[in-house]
Amino acid sequence: MFDPVIQIRGLNVAYGSQQAVRDVSVDIPSRQVTAIIGPSGCGKTTLLRSMCRLVELTEGVRVWGQVLFKGRNLYEPDMDVTEIRKRIGLLAQRPFPLPMSIFENVAYGPRLHGSLKRAELETLVEKELRAAGLWDEVKDRLNEPASALSIGQQQRLCLARGLAVEPEVLLCDEVTSSLDPLSAQRIEGRLLELRSDYSIILVTHVLRQARRLADYVIFMYLGELIEHGPAEQVFKNPHQPRTRAYLAGEF
């Protein structure tokens, strides 16, 4: 047994007539790295984005079932979506730095949600850039536009920006797929260091990455939850034939 940070109950997501997630129920462990794996089009990203209600931004989407965070269903009508996305942050596949300086990218969220003084912001920006492993590379360039950074640096900047609003959960959607191997390694290292303070949920199509990072694994296929459990058990002794076939590279 473990302490769940998110509890999903009977979750369904459909885009028009196409159902992407079918009756999924699973608990996400707190302060661990949970990897969602499965072939392309299996519903991994849809499941991930449903956890912060970003899936609703797609026109025509329908969501039913429950996503419970701190015991409350995130899809209740009176839930504050802005507050949800502050507490459950998303790091996307491609970095999307804001069109402003490196410093202001990290300071943007805290400015929006609070009233920190300049000195407090400077301390916070340094703290989160260090947490993202970027401080030493940009400490003398904080007023330069974020667009001047490399793609790998931009992804770490987006990580720092996400951490600056102090989320409890960090959703990571194929966050290294557009990066060179060294940049990907740096992001992976940061995630491993951060898991003692954050609950990290990672979508990846790279099984080697899931094996390196995951404490817990969820296997999806054709929108359905096929198997979930501790990473060592799923990778070494999967219970379901479709899990075994996927891990063996048969589809």
Placement of each model-derived feature along the sequence:
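ABC ATPase NBD Q-loop/coupling interface
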Residues: 66-83, 143
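Conserved ABC ATPase "signature" region
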Residues: 66-73, 118-139
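Conserved ABC ATPase signature
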Residues: 144-149, 153
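Conserved catalytic motifs of ABC-family nucleotide-binding domains
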Residues: 166
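Catalytic Walker B motif of ABC-type/P-loop ATPase nucleotide-binding domains
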Residues: 170-173
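Helical segment within the ABC ATPase nucleotide-binding domain
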Residues: 184-196
